[in-house]
Every structure is written in C-alpha cells, then in structure tokens.
Amino acid sequence: MLAGCAGEEKDLFDKSAAERLNETGKIYTARLQSSEAGWVMEYYPTNSDEEYKGRGYVILADFDKDESVTLAMNNVMSDDVYMEGRSLWEIIADNGPVLTFNTYNEVLHCFSNPEYYESGKGFEGDYEFVMIDVPEDGEFIMLKGKKRGTYVRLTRLPAGTNFEEYLADIKAFHNGIFPASAVNENVLQVGDKKYSINNANSGMLGMYPHGGDAITETTTHPFLITKRDGKYYLRFRSAIEVDDETSEQEFVYDEANDRFIGTTNEANYIEGEDPVHFFYTVFGSDAHRWQWTRTSEMSESQKAALDEVAAGFRALTNLSLRLVGENVVMRVQYRNSRNQNASVDFIFNVTEEADGITLKYDKPVLDAGANVLPANPALATYLETMSQKFTVTAGSSRFNMNTLRLTAASDSNNWIIVTYY
C-alpha cells in the first residue's frame, strides 16, 4: 500500500510578493533620498534617431522626504534657459518597483505632452521608470522607461551642488568643445575601428568609417555631457560596439591631451582631426584659405618681418595661403600708393609630411607679383623665410581647428597663428 504525499511544499519566502515589493519600494525610496544634492538624470525620450525624440537631455533631480521632487534643466526644451519644476513622486509596485512622477512637472512631462511636437504625439517620452539597479550607497542608479524602454542613468551629485551652476557648466563645456561653428570633423577610435564624427554640437553625433562615405555610411549616436569628480564625461545612449567583445559607451575628457579617453579601455578615444592633414586638405578646393594679418598672434620675429613688409605698402591688409587654379599661392593683399586695394600672388609648393608641412616658394604669379618685389625687398625676404618646414598644431583645441599654429621646425621661437576662412 502506497502512502500519499499529504505534506505541502514549504513556502520559500516568509512574506508575500506584495509585501516584498512594498519593502523594496521603501528601500529604493530611501536610496533616492540619500543624495543630499540630488542626481543627474541622463534622459532619452525614445531610442529614435529623430533629432528631438532621440537626443538626450540632462535633468537634475532632488528627491525630498516629503514626497516632492525638484527637477531642473537648461536645454532646447526650456528655450535654453534654466527652468525648475516641482511635483510629487513615489515608487509603486507594478511587476517590480517603478519610479513615477505622479503629478505634473513641466520639466519632465513636456516630453510626453502631445502638444510639444508636430506629430501630435509629443516626444513620446516616459515619466514612469522601472528600477533596474539601485545599489546601496551607489554612485549610479539605472532606470528603464516603462513604455519606451530607454535606459536612464542617475548619477549622484556631490553635496552643495547648485543646479543652475552645474547645468550652465556642462552646457558651456559642450558648446566649447563641440561648437556649432567647428570647421573640422573629429575622430573616434574603438578597438581597431576608426570613425570620422561630426554634428556633435547637436548631441546627435554622426559617425561613419574613417575614409568612408559620409552620405551613405553615417549612423547617428546620441550622447550627453555630464560632470563628476571635477571631470567631464561623454556618454552615448548606447555603447559603440565593434564586435561582441569590444565596445565603449563612456569617455572622460583628458584636458592635458585635449581628447576623450574610454573609461573601460584608455586605448579607445575621441579627438580632433590631425592638424597637419587638416591644414593640407584646405588646398583641395578654392572654397577656403588660411589667413593672417599683422594683428594675428605671432612670435616677435614674425611680427618684425611683417612690420617691414607693411612699411613697403601704404597698408598691409592680410596674407593668405589658398588654392588658385591648380596652384597653392600666398596672396598678399595691401593698399597701394594711390590708396587702392591690390593683391599679388606667389606660388608655393606644399608638401604634407607625418610631422609637419613644408612650404617651398616657387615664383610670382604674373608680372604684378614680380614688379612688387623690387619695390618691397622685405616682402621678397619674407617669402624666402616662409619657405621652410613647419610643425602644425591646433591654435586652441583640435576639436575646432579654426586656428592653427605654424611653428618653424628649425626654430621654435618662429611661429604664427593662421585662421580658417
């Protein structure tokens, strides 16, 4: 005779699922409140590549113990001025702990308001977030949009942080390192893959294989700039993946070397284009030029030489290196003895080398150039002194090389800043 299994399986938990969720909610609430100054929220409305729906927005959040929250931002959604909003928040149980902003907050709810975008759906952003990772005393908390599934990272702010000053700081850094007026593309290296990048000022970085086709191969990668421990960080919405084992999502700015380096692998980086190559590529068309004047930054020897050249004219307007026809010329623009604008061109051969540019003076263009030289011997001397090798470095930052510094390879005390036009 077989005995029946009358005993019941022992309950693995002392409390019900609802009770456990409620306790977890209390713990997570306390952890959000534990940051005295609040948190940096890296908010992305959707995973779209559309400019406003897919780009990132830095929102600062201070969760108070009275169940109110102060949110702040300074971006295109606030008309690029500082804006604060105050509302209520709580952590609710919904198949797991969910952070909800349950009364209207103009800082966050504008991303879900259908009136804010011409599609009639708004930016389709979330205002409820599944709490994915909320470690005790953690520097970071990871959330996930309940509807759109975009990941939102919270970073603890140091005590005493002023919201308005913090937002102004990172905005100024972003616009300074990636100005809308930047004249050159930049470079991103992850693993053995190198990419050209552009449009970084918008926060919707365009990326294509270095040397590839910018029109057909560009992909879009939204990112945000934040700051912690006195350093600026650039973090993409999604990691840049080269293969299953090689990726990088976040980079920290290395001020000494003017580049961003990967936080997981310092061999990964973002930096400006090579100054030598950028200087040379301007001569690929006649659309742009490198120009300088007597008021440009320069060494004492350069200033003395240009002062002598200027003394031979009624006024020296500017000098430039540019493509004219099939030749690179140094154009000298001046005011003649009749106070008329005039210019003369002198052909230079330009050679790009790994460590610099070599300029070699050839001859004047047409008789006008030849006729000016006897009347202004200082100009003839200047042409010869510019006929040498120069190292080329960024005037201020490789991320925006609207100015470059040419330094004589044979004399580091002979240099001049030239400007991109």
Model-inferred region functions:
Residues 57-63, 87-90, 126-133, 221-223, ...:
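Hydrophobic/aromatic beta-strand elements that line small-molecule binding cavities or substrate pockets
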Residues 6-98, 134-136, 142, 148-150, ...:
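Acidic/polar, low-complexity intrinsically disordered N-terminal segments immediately downstream
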Residues 2-4:
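C-terminal motif of bacterial Sec signal peptides marking the signal peptidase cleavage site
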Residues 117-138:
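A recognition module on extended beta-rich or small alphabeta surfaces enriched in W/G with H and D/E
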Residues 97-115:
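Short solvent-exposed strand/turn elements
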Residues 34-42, 66-70, 96-99, 139-142, ...:
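Short, hydrophobic/aromatic-rich segments at coil-to-beta transitions
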Residues 80-85, 109-115, 152-155, 272-273, ...:
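A short, polar/proline- and glycine-enriched secondary-structure boundary/capping micro-motif
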Residues 157-405, 412-421:
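Preference for solvent-exposed, low-hydrophobicity sequence contexts
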